[in-house]
C-alpha cells in the first residue's frame, strides 16, 4: 500500500530541508504557506505548490505590502528544486489519502497487536526525503495521539531504522524539535527506538531522552572508534560486576548490553544479555507471502490516489475567470458620448 503525506502536513520547515533551500528561499516558502492559509487553499500535492508559486509570482505586487518582498529569482529556484523531487517519486509521495497513524493501532481477532512494516527501499535512496518523512511521522504521532499518561505498556512502538539519516546535516532547530517530541511522546502511549550502527549517530541531547538501551557489539581500533565505545559505555548505569567498556568490544553474536527503565522511573544497571533470535525469516519475504499479507491487512483505502479539489483547481479557475473578464472587456463596444458644439452666429 502507498504511504502518502500532504504538502500542508509536511510543512515549510521540512519541505525546505527536502528541497535544500537557502534561508531566503525558505522564507518565501513560509510566505506561500501563509498565503494558502489566508486564502483557504489546500496544498495537497506538488502541483498545488507549483500552482501557488506561479500564481503568487504573477501577483507579487498585490502581496508585497502584507507578506514582504517576493522575488522572482527565489520563486524560480524553488520551482527548479521541485523537479528532482518529482523525478525521485515526490509526485507519488505527496497527496491523498494521507497516512492516518490511528490505522496502525489495531489488534487481531485474539487481541494481539499488529506489526506494520514500512517498505522504504526506494524512499531511502533519497536520504533527505526519508529523514524528513520519519520526522514528520514522529511529529504526527505526537500531535495526533491523545495524552494518556504513563501506561503499563505502550499502545504503539516505533523502530526507526537507519536513524543516522534522521540527524545527518539536520539544522539545530530540527534536532531540538526531535528532542522535544521524544521527550513528551511517552505520555501519548508511544514508544520510540532509534536503530543505528553507533550511538554516536544520535545527538547527545536526544540520547539523554531515551530510557531503554540495547547495545550490540562495537569493534574499535582507531582512537576515534575507541572514544565512541567509551561514550557508549558511559551512557549506561554502571554495574560493578563488569566493565561496560570492555564488554561492548567482547560481545558475541546474539549478545547485547541492555538497560531499561525500572518501575521507579530510574534506569536499571547495565546487564550483559542473551538476545532471543527473531522467530521469523531473517530477510525479505517472498512475493507470495507479501501479497497475502497485503490482501488481508485492511489497508486497501491507501491503494488508489485521490485528486481532490485543492489549490491547483481553485487557482486555475480563478485565473481562467480573470482572463475571460479581460477578454470580454476588450471585446465590448466603445461607448461614445454625444458631443454638442456651439457654433458662432
Which residues are covered by each model-predicted region?
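P-loop NTPase motor domains
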Residues: 1-180, 250-251, 311
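Flexible loop/turn segments at secondary-structure boundaries
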Residues: 2, 124-127, 165-168, 200-203, ...
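Conserved P-loop NTPase motor module
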Residues: 2-5, 214, 250-344
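Non-catalytic alpha-helical coupling and interface elements of nucleotide-dependent molecular machines
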Residues: 16-24, 34-41, 54-61, 83-91, ...
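Short secondary-structure boundary/capping segments
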Residues: 63-69, 172-176, 208-213, 230-231, ...
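Structured core elements
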Residues: 81-84, 116-119, 157-159, 193-194, ...
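Short, contiguous acidic/charged loop-to-helix segments that flank catalytic cores in large enzymes
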Residues: 125, 169-173, 217-220, 232, ...
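Conserved ATP-driven motor cores of ASCE-family P-loop NTPases powering translocation/secretion/packaging/pilus
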Residues: 180-264
Amino acid at each position: 500500500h502507498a504511504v502518502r503525506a500532504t504538502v500542508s502536513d509536511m510543512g515549510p520547515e521540512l519541505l525546505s530541508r527536502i528541497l535544500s533551500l537557502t534561508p531566503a528561499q525558505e522564507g518565501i516558502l513560509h510566505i506561500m504557506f501563509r498565503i494558502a492559509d489566508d486564502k483557504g487553499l489546500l496544498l495537497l500535492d506538488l502541483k498545488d505548490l507549483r500552482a501557488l508559486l506561479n500564481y503568487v509570482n504573477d501577483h507579487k505586487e498585490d502581496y508585497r505590502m502584507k507578506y514582504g518582498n517576493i522575488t522572482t529569482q527565489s520563486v524560480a529556484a524553488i520551482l527548479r528544486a521541485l523537479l528532482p523531487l518529482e523525478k525521485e517519486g515526490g509526485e507519488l509521495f505527496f497527496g491523498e489519502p494521507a497516512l492516518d497513524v490511528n490505522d496502525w493501532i489495531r489488534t487481531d481477532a485474539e487481541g494481539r497487536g499488529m506489526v506494520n512494516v514500512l517498505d522504504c527501499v526506494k524512499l531511502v535512496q533519497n536520504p533527505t526525503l526519508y529523514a524528513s518523512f520519519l520526522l514528520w511521522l514522529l511529529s504526527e504521532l505526537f500531535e495526533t495521539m491523545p495524552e494518556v499518561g504513563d501506561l503499563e505498556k505502550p499502545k504503539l512502538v516505533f523502530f526507526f531504522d537507519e536513524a543516522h539519516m534522521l540527524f545527518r546535516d539536520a539544522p539545530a532547530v530540527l534536532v531540538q524539535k526531535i528532542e522535544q517530541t521524544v521527550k513528551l511522546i511517552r505520555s501519548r502511549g508511544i514508544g520510540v527506538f532509534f536503530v543505528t550502527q553507533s550511538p554516536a549517530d544520535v545527538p547527545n541531547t536526544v540520547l539523554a531522552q531515551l530510557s531503554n538501551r540495547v547495545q550490540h557489539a562495537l569493534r574499535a581500533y582507531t582512537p576515534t572508534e575507541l572514544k565512541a565505545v567509551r561514550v557508549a559505555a558511559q551512557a549506561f548505569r554502571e554495574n560493578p560486576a563488569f566493565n561496560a567498556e570492555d564488554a561492548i568490544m567482547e560481545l558475541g553474536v546474539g549478545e547485547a548490553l541492555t538497560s531499561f527503565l525500572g518501575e521507579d522511573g530510574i534506569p536499571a544497571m547495565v546487564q550483559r544479555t542473551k538476545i532471543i533470535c527473531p522467530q521469523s525469516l531473517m530477510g525479505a519475504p517472498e512475493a507470495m507471502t507479501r501479497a497475502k499479507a497485503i490482501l488481508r491487512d485492511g489497508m486497501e483505502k491507501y491503494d488508489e490516489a485521490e485528486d481532490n479539489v485543492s489549490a491547483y483547481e481553485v487557482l486555475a479557475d480563478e485565473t481562467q475567470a480573470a482572463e475571460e473578464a479581460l477578454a470580454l472587456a476588450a471585446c465590448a463596444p466603445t461607448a461614445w458620448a454625444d458631443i454638442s458644439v456651439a457654433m458662432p452666429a
